[in-house]
């Protein structure tokens, strides 16, 4: 009988990261997915990254994950979103060639040390004494294991809706999984339904681009991965069009036929990625909504019209599309649809992503209530790392709100749960100025090195980068000019007769890297590796970062203050019954987690801290 230490079920974005991370830690790992072409499948939009999401990708890369490197082998339209705003909200994004992305992912995974791939369907999991024993395939065969990572995406009792038509499926033309849903219910997990959707696909050869707006990418693509020196994939343009009043009229007239508005769908959809029906109803005063026409590949004429996700009947979809400028004669290749699926309340998992009910069972991705490739991949890498570390009897690996967006996401999910598809935003992070895309490796790679999940190649690149940062920082502190000379160059500084270094100049409003290079041409040599830009940001926002680091230190001290599992909140007399009930229900593990529970007052936190000092001052009962 086959036996593996870790088995990952599902080969989507969470699954591939989980399997690769486990394998990198030297643990024999099996990835089970339905077919080869499912590996890294982009079920919805053909793009990676975006605002906050791009930072997640960079963090995955910092831990030697796959997503950043793979998109650099397949990215056909790179764009830094929000670049006119502050660096805390910059969002690296790349349009992908679907075929190139899957090809690169397949080539990497099929040659990955310690990783085997099995193409098949898991029907059930075997548990004994609340511990994982094996997976059972639909052909009845059994594979023994110590740990299982479930990354089921939209396959748990998946149901596609197109108008009034219902199609049981986890994805178009792929069967859903009822067996695993039933098993999870039998175990006692709390399951609910969520919904997501996708737009129709259209034929780019039938679009009149003269009626659309050109959207070029960045002149020089900035890679996601620290392993990528330069993006060698050909770059192409995207285009923008918009809905019209006629589009809106057709949608309003047919709302009763929409699966969402007819009451046919039970699941809640993503608040921040609404269907076109939702947009028309919720934003009824808007006369138009933008649509991004995104090519699905270099040699693929399929276009993804980002912005018109729908569950309307096919004939209505055809009508509304033809009211959009440039799409009057367009050919629809595949209808849009909504898909409903089961997920588990993420408060049933710990911050390691191991379930609280079953030892050795981990969840990652949409099963935890998230939406998005990047959110799934971020969970996958953490689940894979922790499953492998548990096999090796090593301490778990936990990221926090203070050091990563991945940590913010996991803390949000495990503390508050979610009743709608969870998506990452910069606004979810209290420390977003410190948690930028450009410093992801400086925050996380050393942590990955400490547990052995980072390859030797990446270690060398990271070590060299750290050395270069110190060298360039020293240079920036050495190069200087007097205030009088700077004034003659038109740079406004206080005329105090002192010398100003480049780092001093970076703090001046409106002074930028390009100006520094003009004044000190030798800096041009440092520009290629983005270190100069990094140091510019650190200098520009130094005072804010100093204050934020103080906040982070306070946060970390509260996170380190554990709350005993057996604490009885009803014995703390100075807090209200409502708060006592809330704390008893949530069972926070630290003071930091307790503080983040909605409705918990600062006075209640103070009361808990005082109670812990008096009741548990001898260190008993943790």
From Swiss-Prot:
Keyword tRNA processing recorded: yes
Keyword tRNA processing found: yes
Compartments, as annotated in UniProt: Cytoplasm
Primary location recorded for the protein, binned into one broad class: cytoplasm
Entry-linked InterPro entries: FAD/NAD-bd_sf, GIDA_C_N, MnmG, MnmG-rel, MnmG-rel_CS, MnmG_C, MnmG_C_subdom, MnmG_C_subdom_sf
One GO location term (cellular component): cytosol
Signal peptide: none
Keywords: Cytoplasm, FAD, Flavoprotein, NAD, tRNA processing
Database matches in SMART domains: GIDA_assoc_3
GO biological process, alphabetically ordered: tRNA methylation; tRNA wobble uridine modification
Residues binding FAD, per UniProt: 10-15, 122, 177, 366
Gene Ontology molecular function: any one: flavin adenine dinucleotide binding
Protein function: NAD-binding protein involved in the addition of a carboxymethylaminomethyl (cmnm) group at the wobble position (U34) of certain tRNAs, forming tRNA-cmnm(5)s(2)U34.
Cited HAMAP family: MnmG_GidA (MF_00129)
Quaternary context: Homodimer. Heterotetramer of two MnmE and two MnmG subunits.
NCBIfam families per record: mnmG_gidA
Entry protein name: tRNA uridine 5-carboxymethylaminomethyl modification enzyme MnmG
Organism encoding this protein: Rickettsia massiliae (strain Mtu5)
């Amino acid at each position: 009988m086959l036996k593996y230490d870790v088995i990952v079920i599902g080969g989507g974005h969470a699954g591939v990261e989980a399997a690769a991370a486990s394998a990198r830690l030297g643990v024999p790992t099996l990835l089970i997915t339905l077919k080869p072409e499912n590996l890294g499948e982009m079920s919805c939009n053909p793009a990676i990254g975006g605002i906050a999401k791009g930072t997640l990708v960079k963090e995955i890369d910092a831990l030697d994950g796959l997503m950043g490197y793979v998109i650099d082998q397949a990215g056909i339209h790179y764009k830094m979103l929000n670049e006119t705003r502050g660096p805390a909200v910059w969002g690296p994004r790349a349009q992908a060639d679907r075929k190139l992305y899957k090809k690169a992912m397949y080539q990497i995974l099929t040659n990955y040390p310690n990783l085997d791939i099995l193409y098949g369907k898991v029907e059930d999991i075997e548990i004994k004494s609340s511990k994982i024993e094996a997976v059972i395939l639909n052909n009845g065969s059994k594979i023994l294991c110590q740990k299982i990572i479930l990354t089921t995406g939209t396959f748990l009792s998946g149901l596609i809706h197109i108008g009034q038509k219902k199609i049981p499926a986890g994805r178009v033309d792929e069967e859903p999984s009822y067996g695993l849903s039933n098993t999870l219910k039998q175990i006692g997990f709390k399951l609910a339904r969520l919904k997501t959707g996708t737009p129709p696909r259209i034929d780019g050869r039938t679009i009149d681009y003269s009626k659309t707006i050109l959207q070029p990418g960045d002149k020089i693509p900035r890679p996601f991965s620290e392993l990528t020196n330069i993006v060698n994939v050909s770059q192409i343009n995207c285009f923008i069009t918009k809905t019209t009043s006629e589009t809106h009229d057709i949608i309003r007239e047919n709302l009763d036929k929409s699966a969402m508005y007819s009451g046919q769908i039970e699941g809640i959809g993503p608040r921040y990625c609404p269907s076109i029906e939702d947009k028309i109803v919720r934003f009824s005063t808007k006369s138009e909504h933008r649509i991004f026409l995104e090519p699905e590949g270099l040699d693929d004429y399929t276009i993804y019209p980002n912005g018109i996700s729908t569950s309307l009947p096919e004939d209505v979809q055809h009508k509304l599309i033809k009211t959009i400028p440039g799409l009057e004669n367009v050919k629809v290749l595949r209808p849009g649809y909504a898909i409903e699926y089961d997920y588990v309340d993420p408060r049933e998992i710990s911050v390691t992503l191991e379930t609280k009910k079953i030892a050795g069972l981990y969840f990652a991705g949409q099963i935890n209530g998230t939406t998005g490739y990047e959110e799934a991949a971020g969970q996958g890498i953490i689940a894979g790392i922790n499953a492998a570390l548990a096999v090796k009897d090593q301490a778990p690996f936990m990221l926090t709100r203070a050091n990563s967006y991945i940590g913010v996401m996991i803390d949000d999910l495990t503390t508050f749960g979610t009743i709608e598809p969870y998506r990452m935003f910069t606004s979810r992070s209290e420390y977003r100025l410190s948690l930028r895309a450009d410093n992801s490796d400086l925050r996380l790679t050393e942590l990955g090195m400490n547990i052995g999940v980072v390859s030797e190649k990446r270690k060398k690149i990271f070590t060299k980068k750290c050395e270069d940062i110190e060298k360039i920082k020293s240079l920036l502190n050495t190069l200087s000019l007097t205030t009088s000379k700077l004034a003659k160059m038109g740079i406004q500084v206080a005329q105090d007769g002192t010398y100003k270094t480049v780092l001093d100049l970076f703090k001046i409003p409106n002074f930028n890297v390009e100006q520094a290079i003009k004044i000190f041409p030798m800096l041009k040599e440092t520009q290629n590796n983005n270190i100069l830009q990094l140091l510019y940001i650190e200098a520009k926002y130094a005072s804010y970062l100093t204050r934020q680091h103080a906040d982070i230190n306070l946060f970390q001290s509260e996170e380190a203050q554990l709350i005993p599992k057996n604490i009885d909140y009803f014995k703390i007399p100075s807090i209200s019954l409502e708060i006592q009930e809330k704390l008893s229900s949530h069972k926070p593990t630290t003071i930091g987690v307790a503080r983040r529970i909605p409705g918990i007052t600062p006075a209640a936190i103070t009361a808990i801290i005082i109670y812990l000092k008096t009741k548990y001052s001898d260190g008993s009962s943790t």
